[in-house]
Each structure stands twice: as C-alpha cells, then as structure tokens.
Amino acid sequence: MKLQLNFTTDIFSDGDLTNYIKANIGDPWKGTQFEGYVHMGAKQKGVFGEMFVEKIIKSLGHEIAPAPTSTAGHDRIINGIPTEIKFSLATRNKTGGVTRNSCIINHMSKSKDWKRLVFVCINVAVPTNPDDWLMRWFTHDDFCTHLQCTNTLFSSQQGGQKGGNDDYMCSGANVKKLIDEEFVKTLDQF
C-alpha cells in the first residue's frame, strides 16, 4: 500500500486525534510551583524528585550525599544509609484535578543495594497539613518480605512475574493501602 500525500490530513480532519491529545495534556498543577512537571520526561522527573527530597532531608537536619556513581543501586546516602528515592505528583483525575494519595512508585528492585526507600506523593502545591506532601519510607528488608505476601501491594512491571524481571511498582489504590502498612514509616522516624 502506497501512502497517499493527503492521508495524514484525512486522518486528522474529523478532529478526534487532535482532541484526544488536548484532553490528555492538561496540567492540574498550572499556576503552582509544580507547573510543567507533568510534561517532563521520566529522567527529568527523577532528577527533580531527588533534588526535592534532598532539600527536605537537609531541612530536617539529616546528612545527605550523592550516590558514589550514577549506576549505583541507590540515589543518595542519607545518614550513611544507601537510600532510593521515589517522587510523584498525585495522579490526574478525569475532572482536571488530582486524586489524593494516588501516585506511582515504580522501578523498585530487590537486587539493588538500597537499604531504605523514601517515597513522596505531592497532593497539593502548598501544604496545609502534614500529609498534603505525603513522605514515607521503608527498608529494603521489609520490601522484600512484603513481596512474599499473597496480598502484596507491589506488582511486577515490564514483563510481569513470568518475565522474571526484578522490577516492581505500587500505584493507585495500593499506595493508599501502603501508607497504612506497619512497616512504612514517617520521616520523623528516619
């Protein structure tokens, strides 16, 4: 089949494709200090999250240093402990806002050398109560133990359990359950 010159014009003529894009690029953080975050790539979001957590950790009086290499199995060393950092803004909902405590914590691995994992879910741009900026942590040992539970809140990603990939995530309603787990701690317990 030969692609006709007007083919690209024809498939866009009814507006469906263009309208779909417009409906899915809304930024619920517009007008806040997080404006534009949703349009960044995964790498840029990761760097931003690490910078954000570093500033929070320093403000709490903890010592923090970068990982020894960019390929280390952790992002920072906090109080001498290799620490993985996961940061997310609350996920967009269908009304143009966000769903509280619904975020994505992904690319967690059993085989990496982190000892603690800090995760942050930003629910509102300017916090008025402690959990508006939800900040929690858990240990690598607790993560590995929880993975063995039949009702684990973490799921395999990129190939699933049958793919044998050591890559896990927690998202949506499972994040809301995760924050209530006994092994998950607040930053004041760091």
Where are these regions (language model features)?
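Nucleic-acid endonuclease domains
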Residues: 1-81, 86-190
